From Swiss-Prot:
Purpose of the protein: Subunit a, of the mitochondrial membrane ATP synthase complex (F(1)F(0) ATP synthase or Complex V) that produces ATP from ADP in the presence of a proton gradient across the membrane which is generated by electron transport complexes of the respiratory chain. ATP synthase complex consist of a soluble F(1) head domain - the catalytic core - and a membrane F(1) domain - the membrane proton channel. These two domains are linked by a central stalk rotating inside the F(1) region and a stationary peripheral stalk.
Subcellular location, record wording: Mitochondrion inner membrane
Catalytic activity annotation: H(+)(in) = H(+)(out)
Name of the protein: ATP synthase F(0) complex subunit a
Keyword Transcription regulation assigned: no
Gene3D superfamilies per the UniProt record, alphabetical: ATP synthase, F0 complex, subunit A (1.20.120.220)
Main location per the UniProt record: mitochondrion
Gene: mt-atp6
InterPro entries, sorted: ATP_synth_F0_asu, ATP_synth_F0_asu_AS, ATP_synth_F0_asu_bact/mt, F0_ATP_A_sf
Amino acid sequence: MMTSFFDQFASPYLLGIPLILVAMLLPWLLFPAPTSRWINNRLITVQTWLTGRFTNQLMTPLNFSGHKWALLFASLMVFLITINLLGLLPYTFTPTTQLSLNMGFAVPLWLATVIIGMKNQPTIALGHLLPEGTPIPLIPALIIIETISLFIRPLALGVRLTANLTAGHLLIQLIATAVFVLLPMMPAVAILTASVLFLLTLLEVAVAMIQAYVFILLLSLYLQENI
C-alpha cells in the first residue's frame, strides 16, 4: 500500500541494492543497433532520421568547433527522452525525477562550457559578466548579479527537469486516485475524470519529450556563448 504520493519517486531497492542503475541502463537496450546491411529496417531508419533532425536543430546555431559536441548532445537527449517516457508506464521508476541525477548531468556539462570559454576566449567569456554600456556606479553590482546568474544555470537546468516531471506524475496520480474513488459513487463523473486523465497523460508524454529537448537546447546555448 502506498502511504504517500511521493513514494513513487523513491529509488527502488532489491535485497538492499538500489535499482536506479538498472533503470538507467534499460533504455539503451530498447534501441536497435545499426547493422552492416545496405537497407536497414523501418525502426532504425526512423530512429536515424529523428536523431539527425534533432541534432541539426541543436547544432545549426553553433560554429564548426561546436559540432564535436553533436554526438554527446544527441545521445543525452535520446537517453533523457527514453527515460522520461518509460517513467510514464505503470509500476515503473523515473530516474529523472531525482534532482541529484539531473544535477549530475547539468553541472559537469555546464562546467565544461565555462572552462572552454575561459580557455579559448577569456576576454569574451569574462565580458559576459558586464553588459555593454553599463554605468560606472552599477558595475560592481552587475558583476555580482551576473556571476550569481552564471552559477545558477546548472541549478535551473536540474530543477526545471525535476519539477516538471514530478508535477506531471503527481497530477496523474491524483486524478487516477480520484477516478477510482468516484467510480462506485458517481460513475458519470468518474468517466469524465478518466477522460481528463487520458488528456493529461498525452500532455505528459509531450512534456517528457519537450523537457529533454529544452535541457539539451539550453546546454547548446551555453556552449554557443563560449566558443
